[in-house]
């Protein structure tokens, strides 16, 4: 089987939007090549992907490459044409850089190697490291490993918003806590909470593919008895109270259910939310305070913000 590698040259600002476009045309995951991210990871001695310095040679010297792999089928040219139109439409809304699109055809065996080479073990927090399923990895004493298949959609734990959220969970979770994860995606936050001592975790997502992805990842990590994954539209219809409510989703979505999050958080419990771009920080903060939360801590990584809000 032949595969087509689609590569879009863009800016850091447009990475998420371009990634979404690639998902819409059928990509099950994307690869992001950003030399600034690479240099930052190499400079840090704490958290991030475990790379070899020689890997830098494959990265663009400027801008960002967003790559996706789709089957080389008869309708590929139509797919490509639609993608280019959407990229040009995107240009009217934000700086996408050159927006150049290149295509390469590769064989099945090369495809398997091409996308796997981009995924390395990621030290996500003091205690947790995310490891691709195919990697042989020996954890250090007291290090917890989360196994994920990066070929599946909905995130691999390497994005700053996920790192911020997991680090906050690690800092605030207590043994025996009950946790709810809103918009679980790959289930990585739920798995992290379970491995960090939660007594139970309820994971919700509106997307049926995300629900199936999360269920598979939960079972792979041996936390099926602790984590229940269900289809759910934010916190609609959810009853009971939780020690931790966590959500790594965009700010505009967070704003839709802050009052519900307050209602579902136990007194003394916390709402940990990430996925907030810097320019939305004040708006989300004000909405949290208006709902009755006290802002306990705000964490920043690159242009992303995580807010830890406590219910008195």
From Swiss-Prot:
Q: Where is the protein found, in the record's own terms?
A: Cytoplasm
InterPro entries linked to this entry? Ribosomal_L11_MeTrfase_PrmA, Ribosomal_PrmA_MeTrfase, SAM-dependent_MTases_sf
Name the UniProt key words of this record, in alphabetical order.
Answer: Cytoplasm, Methyltransferase, S-adenosyl-L-methionine, Transferase
GO cellular component terms listed in the entry, alphabetical order: cytoplasm
Q: Which reaction does it catalyse?
A: L-lysyl-[protein] + 3 S-adenosyl-L-methionine = N(6),N(6),N(6)-trimethyl-L-lysyl-[protein] + 3 S-adenosyl-L-homocysteine + 3 H(+)
Task: Please indicate if the UniProt record lists S-adenosyl-L-methionine as a keyword.
Answer: yes
Listed under GO biological process in this entry are: methylation
State its Enzyme Commission number(s): 2.1.1.-
GO molecular-function term, one example from the UniProt record: protein-lysine N-methyltransferase activity
- Please tell me where S-adenosyl-L-methionine binds in this chain: 162, 183, 205, 248
- State the family named in the UniProt similarity comment for this chain: Belongs to the methyltransferase superfamily. PrmA family.
- Provide the function of this protein: Methylates ribosomal protein L11.
NCBIfam families, sorted: prmA
- This chain belongs to the protein called Ribosomal protein L11 methyltransferase
Its source organism is: Exiguobacterium sp. (strain ATCC BAA-1283 / AT1b)
């Amino acid at each position: 089987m032949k595969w087509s590698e689609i590569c879009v040259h863009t800016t850091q600002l447009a990475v998420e939007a371009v990634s979404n476009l690639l998902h819409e045309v059928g990509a099950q995951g994307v690869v992001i090549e950003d030399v600034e991210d690479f240099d930052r990871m190499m400079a840090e001695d704490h958290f991030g992907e475990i790379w070899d310095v020689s890997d830098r040679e494959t990265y663009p010297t400027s801008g960002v490459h967003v790559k996706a792999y789709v089957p080389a089928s008869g309708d590929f040219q139509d797919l490509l044409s639609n993608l280019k139109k959407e990229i040009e439409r995107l240009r009217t809304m934000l700086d996408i850089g050159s927006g150049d699109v290149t295509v390469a055809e590769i064989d099945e065996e090369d495809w398997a190697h091409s996308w796997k080479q981009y995924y390395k073990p990621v030290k996500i927090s003091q205690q947790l490291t995310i490891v691709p399923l195919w990697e042989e990895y020996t954890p250090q004493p007291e290090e917890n490993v989360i196994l994920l298949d990066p070929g599946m959609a909905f995130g691999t734990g390497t994005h700053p918003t996920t790192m911020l959220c997991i680090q906050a969970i690690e800092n605030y979770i207590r043994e025996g806590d009950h946790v709810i994860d809103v918009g679980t995606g790959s289930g990585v936050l739920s798995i992290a909470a379970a491995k960090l001592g939660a007594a139970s975790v309820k994971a919700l997502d509106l997307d049926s593919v995300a629900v199936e992805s999360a269920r598979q990842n939960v079972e792979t990590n041996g936390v099926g008895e602790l984590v229940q994954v269900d289809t759910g539209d934010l916190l609609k219809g959810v009853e009971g109270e939780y020690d931790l409510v966590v959500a790594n989703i965009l700010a505009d979505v967070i704003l839709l259910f802050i009052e519900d999050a307050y209602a579902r958080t136990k007194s003394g419990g916390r709402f940990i939310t990430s996925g907030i771009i810097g320019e939305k920080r004040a708006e989300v903060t004000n909405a949290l305070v208006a709902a009755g939360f006290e802002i306990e801590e705000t964490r920043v990584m690159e242009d992303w913000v995580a807010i830890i809000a406590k219910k008195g």
